[in-house]
From Swiss-Prot:
GO cellular component, one term: plasma membrane
Membrane side Cytoplasmic: residue ranges: 1-13, 64-70, 164-171
Protein name in UniProt: Disulfide bond formation protein B
Role noted for this protein: Required for disulfide bond formation in some periplasmic proteins. Acts by oxidizing the DsbA protein.
Lineage: Bacteria, Pseudomonadati, Pseudomonadota, Gammaproteobacteria, Alteromonadales
Species for this entry: Pseudoalteromonas atlantica (strain T6c / ATCC BAA-1087)
Family of this protein: Belongs to the DsbB family.
Membrane topology recorded in Swiss-Prot or TrEMBL: Multi-pass membrane protein
Signal peptide range in chain numbering: none
Amino acid sequence: MTFISNLADTRLAWGLLFLSALVLVAYALFSQHAMGLQPCIMCIYQRTAIFGIMFACVPVLAANNMLTRLFAFTVWGISAIWGGLIAWEHYDIQNAANPFFATCEIVPNFPSWLPLHEWLPNLFAATGDCGNIDWVFMDMSMPQWMMVVFAIYSSIWFVVLASRLIGNRAI
């Protein structure tokens, strides 16, 4: 348990977390721009959650102290859990009994002060349909894989955070 608790003190662990999220974003962009898969709103929200995990790592990589770790754990946990819920909702849309009632928005619902889809359309513009299953790997669609990814991120977050709290360590 001490080993797990000590992971949050190392930049290597935070760097690996950042790198894992970067690989997922790189594959998403490859799927979009090289394979021609069009991301839907739910895909964009999941991509935003992955960017949230990447963003959470940056302060700790710059200066690993209690304040940056508190920020990182908070943003990481919110992003991982929110991403998992979005992936679950996306899966439900794709497998709805009546697809006419399972729809998603046309334009991303980003805050007016942060219109990512307008500022960075190559990353955050949604052009696909949430109900389409255009990609399958090992009998699982993209939302199913993202549920697995976010479950792993959430589980690691919980285990590391719990081990620090149980071991009476500062965040």
